[in-house]
Amino acid sequence: MDNAILKIGDIIESKAGRDKNRYYIVMKIDEPYIWTCDGDLHKVDKIKKKKIKHTKYVGYQSEYVKNKLEYGEKVTNSEIRRALKEFVESKEEGSCDDAKR
């Protein structure tokens, strides 16, 4: 899938840099950059600016995080970590129920 159609709440994987192979959730989009968060190294109050071309869309989205951001509600670091943990666990099992595209 083309990274040009990334949306808020999408889960991406870093393809370059020190954080290569790390998962993030897209918090904000301003092409050619996205602002991402993992709730651990890059927390909600200090989101990471990343070039879109250095990321890979993994095909899933956190509906919970997306909905909170769309309604202007605050997302916590623990909610981000939980969403990413659920994605990784479901990926290992072979399916992800949060939201497929």
Regions found by a protein language model. Name each.
Residues 20-21, 30:
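Short, well-ordered loop/turn elements at secondary-structure boundaries
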